[in-house]
From Swiss-Prot:
One of its GO terms (cellular component) is plasma membrane. Involved in the import of serine and threonine into the cell, with the concomitant import of sodium (symport system). Belongs to the dicarboxylate/amino acid:cation symporter (DAACS) (TC 2.A.23) family. GO terms for molecular function: neutral L-amino acid:sodium symporter activity. It is found in: Cell inner membrane. Pfam families: SDF (PF00375). InterPro entries: Na-dicarboxylate_symporter, Na:dicarbo_symporter_sf, Ser_Thr_transp_SstT. The chain crosses the membrane at residues 13-33, 43-63, 81-101, 140-160, 191-211, 215-235, 297-317, 338-358, 362-382. Coiled coil: none annotated. This is Serine/threonine transporter SstT. Keywords: Amino-acid transport, Cell inner membrane, Cell membrane, Membrane, Symport, Transmembrane, Transmembrane helix, Transport. It comes from Vibrio cholerae serotype O1 (strain ATCC 39315 / El Tor Inaba N16961). It is a multi-pass membrane protein. It catalyses: L-serine(in) + Na(+)(in) = L-serine(out) + Na(+)(out); L-threonine(in) + Na(+)(in) = L-threonine(out) + Na(+)(out).
Amino acid sequence: MQNNSFLARLVRGNLVLQILAGILLGAAMATFSPEYAQKVGLIGNLFVGALKAVAPVLVFILVASSIANQKKNQHTYMRPIVVLYLFGTFSAALTAVILSFLFPTTLVLATGAEGATPPQGIAEVLNTLLFKLVDNPVSALMNANYIGILAWGVGLGLALHHSSSTTKAVFEDLSHGISQIVRFIIRLAPFGIFGLVASTFATTGFDALAGYAQLLAVLLGAMAFIALVVNPMIVYYKIRRNPFPLVLQCLRESGVTAFFTRSSAANIPVNMALCEKLKLDEDTYSVSIPLGATINMAGAAITITVLTLAAVHTMGIEVDLMTALLLSVVAAVSACGASGVAGGSLLLIPLACGLFGISNDIAMQVVAVGFIIGVIQDSAETALNSSTDVLFTAAVCQAEHEKRA
């Protein structure tokens, strides 16, 4: 009976407070028992693995089900959401350029990224994304290719739109069943994050980051400015009321989990659950959230821009205003393709460095610096990217709902 009441309290408890407790316990274990802390990292890896496993199936079934069951004259709000995604990513790149000029950073270049192969140009990044669109559906599900999964989900949904009500009901029941599995996995977040924090702190520590304090300050400062100043301004423009309750809820309930899982794909189920909690339009968020995990990359745009300009300052290259603006555009477009590159935003740095004639050898040393600070940079980048997916979806859904009310 006591066990049942403990489990009931666990299920009914405040998830954010439970996650906070997991963070504190993980940090304490890493401090006092690093050896044991590395072992409990298994719990964290299992949690991330479970989220990554369920996410592709969730997206495919949810998209197919919502489109197949869509009523006539029912509106989805994808166009304004995509516009916000692209505008937000460009704003992030521009903010990073301004901060990099205000606080120029030079790097002690590192080695250690020799095994990585960056794309040869922006055409290659866009080409990769285009071919992901026509991937085999089984391959797309196995490799968590969300562009391909979305394409097949939308295609199947449209094909089943005129099918019998029984077929549609099967897909709807499947989507509810998978959503239940997702809710169960999300309730395990405190344990997963406890394991992730404990193993990360025990393995990495923060001594390695001390030498890159200014670079991290510029990176994190730009991300914080986007999260707490630019995004609220964009949301206010859409909903015309105080944006901070929504902004802070998205950061708290999506950003915190994304920070520790360091995976936009793993955070898709968390974002879907938050959209459901906010009572947003399911036909819209079932498409906009996985699409956002692929193209809404404000954090990646900041990483590419800041590290590229740090390389520029290190090499003593003069940069004029037009080149800086061009870098913002290249960083924003490259960031939208970051999901199509193994290694993500860091391996798009050589592409941006090419604008300034920086050799590939130097650019790959900058990438190596990115790997050193990755424990913080990648976490903060994912938190910003993923929480913004929900934020912009919620802002558009709420604004459109009030317009039609």
